[in-house]
Amino acid sequence: MEEVWELWTTKGGLEMWWGPEGFTTAVSKLDLRPGGEFEYAMTATSPDAVEAMKSAGLSLTSVARGRYAEITPRRRLAYVTVADFIPGVAPYEVAAVVEIHPASGGVRMVVTEDAMHDDLWTQRSMMGMNSSLDRLTKVLDARHGQRRAPR
């Protein structure tokens, strides 16, 4: 659980996997405490990601800002991000909770996110999170030289 916690809560950990496939992330601020702020830039780098961003009318790089709401080391991380990158939509907050549980032979993560302003953006958010979690699994697999069961 310590390793998964580190990947969720450190600059180096997040930069290894955060963001959908085809994106890189650069963390510029990470104050891991309740009320602490974080900020990162996520950039589309693969041809497919670049095309998807352009077709959605979005910048290739978006800066995300948020704050930590709750921190229970190695168990629970709650945070709020500001969705301020959507053309024609006023900024609003989106809450998320990550729960980390011991499981037979490993760790079980439960990630819960608020819905976004409409079904399309909620679906995009879910797809992005699922892709990010796939990348997290690959990081863990590479570290342990094994393949894990699908989520």
Locate the predicted segments by residue:
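A short, structured loop/turn motif at beta-sheet edges
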Residues: 1-2, 30-35, 69-76, 99-108, ...
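Hydrophobic ligand-binding cavity/cleft-lining segments
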Residues: 1-25, 29
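Hydrophobic pocket/interface hotspot
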Residues: 4, 14, 38-40, 68, ...
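Surface loops and adjacent helix of pleckstrin homology
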Residues: 19, 43, 82, 112, ...
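Short solvent-exposed loop/turn micro-motifs enriched in small/polar/acidic residues
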Residues: 22-24, 61, 91-93
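Glycine-rich portal/gate segments that line the openings of hydrophobic small-molecule binding cavities
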Residues: 26-82
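Beta-strand/loop substructures that line and gate deep hydrophobic ligand-binding cavities in soluble
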Residues: 69-70, 78-130
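Short, highly charged C-terminal tails/helix-capping segments
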Residues: 138-151
